[in-house]
Regions:
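Helix-loop element at the rim of GNAT/NAT acetyltransferase active sites that forms part
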Residues: 5, 16-32, 41-42
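Conserved beta-strand in the GNAT
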Residues: 52, 59-68
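Conserved acyl-donor/pantetheine-binding loop and adjacent beta-alpha core of acyl/acetyltransferases
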Residues: 70-114
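A short beta-loop-alpha structural element at the N-terminal edge
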Residues: 2-16, 68
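C-terminal "cap" of GNAT-fold acetyltransferases
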Residues: 144-158, 163-185
Length: 185
């Protein structure tokens, strides 16, 4: 297994990983929907901020995707949200609320990330290695900090991020948590 930069040949594997690791019913039903919201933007617009966990045949079985600037991401994401028009009204509201809630932390933590790994790559230290690869990359680009959202009931993920130096920034109970990590003073 190897951590490496995203290559265009990884695109469909990354989209498959995004869909296979989705848990919300609407996302499980629609690969296009979950990928529009959580994968395609990063691969299309910020591929240099994307890293994959590749198996011995060089196939992506995990990834970490990042947008280094929340404001640029918010503007560029509009066409993706428009394409995702099938998303239910309540899910759109929740997405907007999460975005608004994060505005208070974007100055200190301007980047955000998504990380997903298929079961065969989990619990082997690769999640930490993906975080380290992205954090080093963002640090070298002068990015001050990075944050992420995680489900409120995902206690394993809470422990994982805390063990990797992420601090709880916002707790929305069952709706989720926002964690962040400073990369530069």
């Amino acid at each position: 297994m190897e951590i490496r930069s995203f290559k265009e040949k990884d695109r469909e594997n990354c989209r498959d990983i995004c869909h296979k690791t989705a848990t919300a019913p609407a996302y499980v039903k629609s690969k296009d929907l979950v990928c529009l919201l959580y994968c395609d933007y990063y691969l299309d617009n910020e591929p240099d901020n994307c890293f994959v966990l590749a198996d011995d045949e060089d196939n992506a079985i995990g990834y970490i995707l990042s947008a280094e600037d929340q404001w640029a991401y918010t503007k560029a994401m509009k066409p993706y949200l428009k394409k995702a028009g099938r998303i239910s009204f309540s899910e759109k509201i929740m997405h907007q609320l999460a975005s608004l809630a994060e505005k208070g932390v974007t100055k200190k933590y301007p980047a955000h990330l998504h990380i997903d790994i298929l079961p065969e790559g989990q619990r082997k230290g690769y999640g930490t290695k993906l975080l380290e690869a992205l954090e080093g990359h963002l640090r070298a680009k002068g990015v001050k900090g990075v944050r992420l959202g995680v489900g409120g009931d995902n206690k394993g993920a809470h422990s994982f991020y805390e063990a990797n130096g992420y601090v709880l920034l916002r707790n929305f109970g069952a709706f989720g948590r926002v964690y962040g990590k400073e990369l530069l003073p």
